[in-house]
């Protein structure tokens, strides 16, 4: 078992910002654990621009922003391919590392685990289980990291801002956005979001519309929706479930840390301390979802 001054779980904007600030303050024994093979968090998957202005005074694509964050944290011990399994008292963290299962201890531990979208299964959408159903994050990984085009015509379920990230990803990959589906009377993204989706991307925006079922054998062939009592099957070969973010609390909920029922993340005080004062939390783990610059600022 090894002990460090500070242990940070998550190498996204919040985790890397904290590492950079600790380095600036002269705290050298800082270790960052990241389950993916590369540091940078969700922005690595976002090939479009819109990142970095508040942090670096540059408008950057997601990968460029992630690269800048990692560069700023140069000299920090960032251990990729390492997954935290359990949080224990006194800053002990069990993790799967390239060497096997280890216990790594931090005199202080920062949880910067981020957030995730709600997938099809958690939304209780019926129908078949064909290939071609994604979250925005999965779509972006396939397009920007795997460099594949997973479908040609897609429907986006949800109209939060992240849905527009899906639209930009589709444009990059040459995927036709057929429609955007929203259950409420108006889309969630601020105006003129609906106009942009229709006019700039050519997508139908269907408000007051409920997803009924997914059709297809082997591969998606359509999405059945209901609007004003009438049902329609929208022909498509891809469905993207976007938004409805929830904190990434898979290892927090089974732990000894208290959970805030209002946010789903850990309870913190005004200093970001959890119910066990050895642990702190920052970023989108606390109340999804905020922009990357907010997570960066909280980490610092």
Placement of each model-derived feature along the sequence:
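A Rossmann-like FAD-binding core segment of flavoenzymes
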Residues: 70-73, 78-95, 171-253, 258
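Internal hydrophobic alpha-helix adjacent to the cofactor/substrate pocket in enzyme cavities
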Residues: 293-300
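General beta-strand structural signal in soluble alpha/beta enzymes
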Residues: 32-35, 78-80, 104-105, 111-113, ...
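FAD-binding core/adjacent interface of flavoenzyme oxidoreductases
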Residues: 1-9, 65-153, 224-231, 240, ...
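Hydrophobic alpha-helical scaffolding
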Residues: 56-63, 237-242, 289-293
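Short glycine/serine/threonine-rich phosphate/pyrophosphate-binding segments
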Residues: 15-18, 119, 136-139, 162-167, ...
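FAD-site-proximal beta/loop scaffold in flavoenzymes
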Residues: 133-143, 238-289
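Beta1-alpha1 glycine-rich phosphate/pyrophosphate-binding loop at the start
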Residues: 4-64, 68, 141, 151-194, ...
């Amino acid at each position: 078992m090894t002990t460090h001054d500070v242990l940070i779980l998550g190498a996204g904007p919040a985790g890397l910002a904290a590492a950079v600030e600790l380095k600036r303050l002269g705290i050298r024994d800082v270790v960052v654990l990241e389950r993916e093979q590369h540091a940078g968090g969700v922005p690595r998957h976002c090939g479009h621009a819109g990142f970095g202005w508040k942090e670096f005074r540059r408008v950057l694509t997601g990968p460029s922003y992630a690269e800048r964050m990692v560069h700023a944290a140069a000299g920090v011990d960032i251990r990729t391919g390492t997954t935290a399994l359990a949080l224990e008292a006194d800053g002990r963290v069990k993790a799967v590392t390239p060497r096997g299962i280890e216990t790594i201890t931090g005199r202080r531990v920062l949880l910067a685990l981020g957030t995730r979208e709600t997938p099809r299964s958690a939304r209780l959408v019926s129908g078949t289980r064909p290939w071609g159903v994604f979250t925005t994050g999965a779509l972006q990984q396939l397009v920007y990291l795997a460099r594949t085009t997973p479908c040609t015509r897609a429907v986006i379920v949800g109209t939060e801002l992240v849905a527009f990230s899906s639209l930009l990803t589709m444009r990059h990959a040459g995927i036709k956005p057929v429609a955007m589906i929203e259950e409420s009377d108006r889309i969630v993204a601020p105006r003129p979001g609906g106009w942009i989706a229709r006019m700039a991307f050519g997508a139908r925006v269907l408000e007051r519309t409920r997803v009924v079922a997914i059709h297809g054998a082997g591969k998606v062939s359509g999405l059945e929706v209901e609007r004003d009592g009438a049902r329609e099957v929208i022909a498509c070969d891809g469905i993207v479930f976007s938004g409805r973010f929830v904190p990434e609390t898979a290892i927090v909920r089974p732990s000894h840390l208290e959970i805030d029922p209002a946010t789903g993340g850990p309870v913190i005080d005004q200093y970001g301390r959890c119910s066990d004062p050895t642990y702190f939390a920052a970023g989108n783990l606390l109340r999804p979802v905020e922009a990357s610059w907010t997570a960066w600022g909280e980490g610092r």
